[in-house]
A protein has these predicted regions:
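A short, structured loop/turn motif at beta-sheet edges
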Residues: 18-21, 41-49, 86-94
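N-terminal secretory signal peptides
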Residues: 1-34
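Short, well-ordered, aromatic-rich surface patches in folded extracellular/luminal domains
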Residues: 1-8, 57-140
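A mature extracytoplasmic/lumenal domain signature
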Residues: 20-22, 30, 54, 89-91, ...
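A short-motif feature that recognizes glycine-rich, charge-decorated loops
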Residues: 25-64
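Residue-level detector of beta-strand structural context in well-folded domains
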Residues: 14-16, 38, 83
Length: 140
């Protein structure tokens, strides 16, 4: 599952779910668009491939809340969205809350672990084709 929260701006807010049968569920959480749900399917092999990719990027080794880790979130900017990724694997379930305002430096550089996590978040969106349904939120 992947969930993106609102930010101060037009960041789209939604939740994506993928079943082991390849069933996708997209739920909009944008203000004014709440409750819009879309379903579709992808190949059943998509979920095992994403779980394998999660292992490769070190997802299961990350803390459950990036913002609470002073090494991974040394500098914090305001008004960014949060992305919550939950992976239900056979042996374990892991949930990571990634506040996108977390940086290593004031120049907005991130540590490699965060760079890999955020690339994985984009991979999940891409594998499930969420761009078909995502609408920018109304400016807050």
């Amino acid at each position: 599952m992947l969930e993106r929260t609102v930010c101060y701006g037009t960041c789209p807010a939604y939740r994506l779910r993928l079943s082991n049968r390849g069933e996708i569920r997209f739920d909009s959480h944008n203000p004014g668009d709440e409750g819009r749900r879309v379903t579709d399917t992808v190949a059943a092999a998509t979920l095992p491939a994403l779980i394998s990719r999660a292992k490769t990027v070190g997802f299961f080794d990350l803390p459950s809340e990036i913002a609470a880790d002073s090494v991974l979130c040394h500098n914090r900017a305001t008004d960014h969205p949060t992305v919550i990724v939950t992976v239900f694997a056979r042996a374990q379930t892991k949930r990571v809350e990634d506040y996108h305002g977390c940086f290593e430096t004031v120049e907005h550089e991130t540590l490699p672990a965060i760079t890999r996590l955020r690339a994985f978040e984009v991979e999940v969106d891409s594998a499930l084709g969420s761009s078909r349904w995502v609408r920018p939120a109304n400016r807050r």
